[in-house]
Amino acid sequence: IRDRYDMTRFPYGETVVMLQPAVHVDDLGDKVEDWGNPVETVFHNVAIYASASQEDEAAGRDSDYEHWSMLFKQPVVGADYRCRWRIRGVVWEADGSPIVWHHPMSGWDAGTQINVKRKKG
């Protein structure tokens, strides 16, 4: 029986989709990212919450961007700063690289945090 506060997953979390560009080689042999038909990876039971840009807060100004954060209990293989994310039907840009939370004293892996942003309006 799982404890009601089981921290191995977020049982009431949401489903999000990681979007990664397809990569093609052009006529010159260079790799080119193609966002026309991105590769989609689905993640379930993700915690999502609104967050703020630290840069804007430090400067004391409002941002032109809306910021959210996602917490994953499972590994997020392939996620990086170039990914886009579909959350509640809206596409967001990654805001930096994923952050893996690992407790230095106990070795507990708390999960992965991914910050995203999108232009307001």
Predicted regions located by residue number:
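N-terminal intrinsically disordered, low-complexity, charge/repeat-rich segments that act as generic
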Residues: 1-17
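Short, conserved turn/kink motifs that form compact alpha/beta structural patches or helix kinks used as
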Residues: 12, 20-121
